[in-house]
Amino acid sequence: TKKNLPQCLVICDDMADTGVMHQATNILATCFIRGRHLGLSTWLSVQKLSTIHPVARANFQFILCWELRNRKELFDGILFELSNIHSVDMLFELYKMATEDPHSFLYVNLRRKPVEFYVRFEEKLVID
């Protein structure tokens, strides 16, 4: 019989200045690459997507994006990162819909095929 692994969650908040976010051969990248095989989930909270190493970004299961103050970060970071899923224009419209209310955010479920977009966790955004 298959034995279930114990589950563990690691939450890292705003570690961009530590240097650990920028290296492919660090414990944080290992958490993303091998963690799921060990029953480990890793959540990152960052102000800039570009501070996360591409190896970690390639293993994201979801993205939560609140309203950003900087359009460059929005377009060069979030929207460009997701541009293989939909056009940047479409992604920008989804972002605007999801973040128009105070404290609201765009939830992108990258585990679903096709990828799903939500306003918070409440309202699914349907793309025609």
Residue positions per predicted region:
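P-loop NTPase motor core of the ASCE superfamily
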Residues: 6, 23-24, 30-32, 74-128
